[in-house]
Amino acid sequence: MYEQFGVEGLITFQKTVDYCHEKDLIVIGDVKRGDIGSTSAAYAIAHLGKVQVGAKKIPAFNEDFATVNPYLGSDGITPFLEVCKEEKKGLFILVKTSNPSSGEFQDQMIGEKHLYEMVGERVAEWGSELMGDSYSYVGAVVGATYPEQGKLLRKVMPKSFILVPGYGAQGGKGEDLVHFLSLIHI
């Protein structure tokens, strides 16, 4: 929403991120980035890394996590994973989103599996390279509006944090959230 206001919006976004860090909050940049490798590398540096300016490396937006669209494949994800390893940051990859039309693509069958399940498997694979104490720094976005898919995806990604949008106004219910929880203790 910040971007609709142009440069002033981005400046305000930066100030918001800085303020949250001053308050010791974890910042998730819901930016849904993803592109070809070189462009994803630039996005990864901008949101999670440090950019070289002369002799200095300085953070740009400096979120702790960013949401990423996997539709372009590993070419678009790998640059983010590399920056996350270097900077000890994380990702939330779109797997099964909460919006009503998400099924137009995410529910398509490829062989015996839905596309969202295959993406979940890749999230688990990518996440195995970026493990914290119990959970991976590579998480997933799975909408509260799809509790059955959430139940399946929790099994596919047992060590991934799941960011669960869609609770409340979009129709996700509290009792459905249990499917998104894991038995791993932090």
Region locations from a protein language model:
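Conserved anion-binding
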Residues: 35-138
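Short hydrophobic/aromatic-enriched beta-strand-loop microsegments
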Residues: 160-165
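Active-site glycine- and acidic-residue-rich loops that bind
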Residues: 4-6, 68-77, 141-149, 167-172
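N-terminal active-site wall of soluble small-molecule enzyme domains
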Residues: 1-59, 149
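Conserved small/polar residues in nucleotide/adenosyl-binding loops
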Residues: 185-186
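Surface-exposed amphipathic alpha-helices with a cationic face
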Residues: 17-21, 81, 85, 124-128, ...
